[in-house]
A protein has these predicted regions:
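Short glycine-rich or small-residue beta-strand-to-loop segments that form or flank ligand, phosphate
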Residues: 85-91, 228-231, 240, 407, ...
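An N-terminal, well-structured beta->alpha segment
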Residues: 3-103, 191-193, 198-226, 237
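Gly/Ser/Thr-enriched, mixed-charge loops and adjacent short helices
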Residues: 12, 16, 34-39, 43, ...
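Conserved phosphate/anionic-ligand binding catalytic regions in large, soluble enzymes, centered on
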Residues: 39-59, 143-144, 233-241, 245, ...
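N-terminal small/polar loop signature for handling phosphorylated ligands or for N-terminal nucleophile
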Residues: 87-150, 248-308
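Glycine-rich phosphate-binding loop plus the immediately following alpha-helix
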Residues: 156-186, 323-346, 351-362, 417
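Phosphate-binding and adjacent anionic-ligand microenvironments
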Residues: 289, 293-295, 316-318, 336-522, ...
Length: 560
């Protein structure tokens, strides 16, 4: 195995090395720490594909690591009976177009047709295109809501769902056989176009995607045209599809946050373009103070997550959490479909193990089977696929995760913020007809089912030493599990890496505490972070908030 310094020297010795890559490598000459950080490993490839910091080296996102991954994907696909066609999309992130072109060049050289969106488009539109065009796989160049220094390479299967662990392992095995310089086949981009191996996805595909979302309407739309919205795409891809959908719905009172309207991979107004974070929604909230809308909607750069704020009744606006919106929409969909007689027999809703436990009593009230999966919407998409294989895809009525991902139909197999926009607008309009806001709605649900409070604490571990620290922390928690957390006895520990949970093995620890509270520890699959999910329940808002605050302090202690 080559050392980091040997790899560094080999990269610099390459003829015709990309100028930007060469400049960065020359700039760190003699800096052992910088060289090691860029070359001590290859970027990890898993079910989420690749994700990493932009830059030079094997541990960075650059045209060479993208080429290598694509060659491995091509080798995998060519060894299967799947269609030799791959759809590619990219969002607004820096180098998105470059990586798209490089991936297409590699695919074309391997006799695989690359179907490329001609401009940046949402991730769910890529999931749609894979199935719509009959592709064997899909690639989306995105790092979702990560900071601007990141980009990624997300791989989808022929079903439009993110790849399974089994497929990821096969693709990884193929990638590991590829030398990023000598082992990659390439054609000139224009030559690939002329040969018919690189083709542009036409507008009909995208228009039909928006129509498919529109067809997911649950209610009759009464009052929806009266809604007044402020919308921000957070300098990402959402504007085109969201505005097309709103026009179909008859929602014309839409004000777009001007500073965040244009795609910009530097995300100048919000370092973390994540609608879960107040800072990302701040410009929208400021505009709300002037425009006084019924709703503020924000979609992340690849338009698969949707954040919402509503009037708080005190002259301001209150952000709705991902769990709260998931519960509002689950209740709205169940209530409306039962009322309209459109609820299927044996309905199924799906959520994840880290999403709110409040979904359980809500689903039970309406006679809906609630399935829980591992973290990641790909597992929700997998459940849709299983129902489809059984000939009962219509049983699926809704899926959500706490990180602002929602999907109410089988038109795509990933979270879809365009679909979420439809659902949120529908629910807001329905409650408005009852003289209520979405804030009133969640308050009524809390009074009915109990006050559930969920929070996420993220602990960052950067660089080479960070990975080892994360591994050692998880090892320690397994070897010496806590007997109590925040003063609450640990009644049961579930280790998803060893226990017979009925789910695939995963590096997740779950602590069930006295009083019905819960704490879960999970290293991120895409970032150098350990995520701790807190869940508290109380008879009042104050009680649940107090327990949550205690759990947050305890989480910090666990991570030290």
């Amino acid at each position: 195995m080559n050392t980091a310094k040997e790899l560094y020297d080999r990269w610099l010795a390459q003829p015709e090395l990309d100028t930007a890559v060469a400049e960065e490598l020359h700039g760190i000459a003699g800096d052992d720490a910088a060289i090691t950080d860029r070359f001590y490993r290859d970027l990890e490839f898993g079910t989420g594909g690749l994700r990493g910091v932009l830059g030079a080296g094997t541990n960075r996102m650059n045209l060479y690591t993208v080429r290598k991954a694509t060659q491995g994907l091509a080798d995998y696909l060519n060894a299967t009976d799947l269609p030799k066609k791959i759809a590619i999309a990219h969002d607004s992130r820096n180098n998105g177009e470059l990586f798209t072109r490089e991936a297409a060049r590699v695919l074309a050289a391997n006799d695989i047709t690359a179907c490329v969106y001609p401009r940046l488009e949402p991730t769910p539109a890529l999931s749609w295109a894979v199935r719509y065009l009959g592709c064997g796989a899909g690639v989306c160049i995105t790092a979702s809501h990560n900071p601007a220094k990141y980009n990624g390479y997300k791989v989808y299967g022929a079903d439009g769902c993110q790849i399974t662990l089994e497929v990821a392992d096969k693709i990884l095995a193929a990638i590991e056989k590829v030398d990023c310089f000598d082992g990659v086949k390439l054609v000139d981009y224009e030559a690939g176009v002329q040969a018919g191996r690189i083709v542009s996805i036409d507008d009909k595909c995208l228009d039909d995607f928006v129509q498919a979302v529109y067809d997911q309407r649950v209610g009759d739309g009464t009052g929806i045209e009266q809604l007044k919205l402020v919308y921000t795409p957070l300098n990402g891809t959402g504007l085109e599809c969201v505005k097309k959908l709103l026009a179909k719905l008859g929602v014309t009172h839409v004000t777009v946050v001007p500073e965040q309207e244009t795609p910009d991979g530097n995300f100048p107004t919000c370092p973390y373009p994540n609608p879960e974070i107040r800072e990302a929604m701040q410009k929208g909230l400021e505009l709300c103070d002037k425009a006084h809308p019924d709703l503020l909607l924000g979609t992340d750069p690849d338009c698969d997550r949707c954040g919402t704020a509503v009037p708080d009744g005190k002259g301001g606006y209150r952000l709705i959490t991902g769990n709260e919106m998931g519960i509002i929409l689950l209740d709205y969909i169940c209530r409306t479909r039962l009322t309209r007689g459109t609820m299927p027999k044996d309905p199924v809703a799906v959520t994840t193990i880290v999403s709110t436990d409040m979904a359980t009593p809500v689903a039970k009230k309406y006679g809906v089977e609630l399935r829980r999966t591992l973290t990641g919407f790909k597992f929700i998409g997998e459940q849709i696929g299983k129902l489809e294989a059984e000939g009962h895809v219509e049983r699926y009525i809704f899926g959500f995760e706490e990180s602002y991902g929602y999907l109410s139909g089988g038109h795509v197999r990933d979270k879809d913020a365009v679909n979420a926009t439809l659902l949120v607008c529908e629910a807001a309009a329905w409650y408005a007809q009852q003289g209520m806001t979405l804030l009133d709605a969640i308050e009524a649900l809390y009074k009915e089912f109990g006050y559930y409070r969920n929070a996420l604490c993220s602990f960052a571990f950067e660089g080479e030493t960070g990975m080892y620290t994360m591994q050692n922390l998880m090892k320690t928690l397994r070897a010496d599990p806590p007997k109590e957390i925040a003063g609450y006895a640990v009644e049961r520990v579930a280790d998803y890496d060893t226990d017979g949970t009925g789910l695939p093995r995963a590096n997740v620890l779950e602590y069930h505490l006295a009083g019905g509270h819960k704490l879960m520890v999970r290293p991120s699959g895409t970032e150098p972070k350990i995520k701790v999910y807190l869940s508290a329940v109380g008879k009042s808002e104050a009680e649940a908030d107090a327990v949550n605050a205690e759990l947050a302090k305890a989480a910090e202690m666990l991570m030290k």
